[in-house]
Amino acid sequence: MIENFKEDRCIVCHLKNRAMDKFFDDFLYESVNDYSLRDRIRKGGICPGHARKLESFGDVLAHAIIYSDLLRSFKHNHHIEILPRKKKTQGQNICVFCEKEQGFEDIYTRAFSYFFFTSPQFKSAFAERGFICQRHLNQVLEKTASVSAKRELLSVLESKIDKILNHLERIKEKNDYRNIHINYTADEIRAWHMAVEFVAGTQ
């Protein structure tokens, strides 16, 4: 995990997205002929976000196989389920890819919680050059039993957020008519992107 720290990206989003890319790749080239998996998609549907993500991989044959199933299902039932990205009720279906994504998030947030609590090297590296979005921060905090570890993690994040806020204030000041000639610095531009990363994460 440490080697993947970067100060302007959420470590959990990065690892989860990398794992999902591999899962999509494996699905398209190996699992698309897995009848049980295709049956789950046919019966349960696929969320719009992951439908578009899958489309971006551009495998024409795999899409022909998957969407033939879905369109035939529509002809029989006059319905293709468009799923929310999260399961809303106990009985509701969930997109196969959302389910996998949530599994990866669980793995990486548990790992983060464990290493932050047990490894001084991990803690120091994260404080120096790591970052995490608010959604994954909340998941890590839920998995962290130690109150002192929670406080320490929040303290590290608050310090990072203070630096972001400082740069955002500089951006606002430079939009005053008296300072309009002053260019934004690289750190200020990075802070803008980090603010978005913290609030929204990386899909």
Swiss-Prot record:
Matching Pfam families: DUF6062
Q: Which InterPro entries match?
A: DUF6062 (IPR045706)
Name under which the protein is recorded: Uncharacterized 23.9 kDa protein in xynA 3'region
